[in-house]
Amino acid sequence: MKELKRVILKLSGEALSGEAKSGYDDALIEDIAHQVKKIVEKGIDVGVVIGGGNYWRGRSNDNIDRTKADQIGMLATVMNCIYTADAFRVFKTNILTPFECGSMTKLFSKDRANKYFEKGMVVFFAGGTGHPYFSTDTGIVLRAIELDADAILLAKAIDGVYDSDPKINPAAKKYDTLPIQEVVDKK
């Protein structure tokens, strides 16, 4: 197996809330910070993408335009990154977004992210891709490709891939394996 030099960690917003299903579980976030510290101490760059599901599930709300719902979701990821980066006090951190957020974050650029990694910082990527209709799962893949990450690590509040949302559909089918062609055919 290739030696890892850079990884991007994806935390679902729901995973941050633990059993509460909203807000934050501080003990859990502290544990995540200690796990990330072990990775950083091995000389591996760590980027973090966090979802917004502990605050906003826009796709489940028919009372708002999808674009606006996704924009609210992007802002939820910014809130989660600000909170979590503060909890990661054992590191120097920075938060990058694909859109301006005043003084709370910095605007994403590949060069800026690489400079932060060179300084040993844990870099948080908030706001997804900055465009509606794309999940933070898309954002993590985009950032991983842009930044030549060796791996994407997922920490989500779900145990696999399903044909529909198992929280909404109790009869959702879990896939043990899922060939890419099957995904393409189902689209």
Feature-to-residue mapping (PLM):
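Ligand-binding beta-strand-loop-alpha-helix segment within the catalytic cores
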Residues: 61-123, 138
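Loop/turn-to-beta-strand initiation segments
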Residues: 43-47, 120-123
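Short beta-strand segments
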Residues: 8-12, 50-51, 96, 125-127, ...
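Internal active-site segments that recognize and position negatively charged phosphoryl groups
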Residues: 89, 111-163
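N-terminal glycine-/serine-/threonine-rich phosphate-binding loop
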Residues: 1-46
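Short, charge-patterned binding micro-sites
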Residues: 50-66
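Polyanion-binding loop/helix "lid" in catalytic or ligand-binding cores
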Residues: 28, 32-35, 128-131, 172-187
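Short, active-site-adjacent cap segments at secondary-structure transitions
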Residues: 15-17, 53-58, 102-103, 131-132, ...
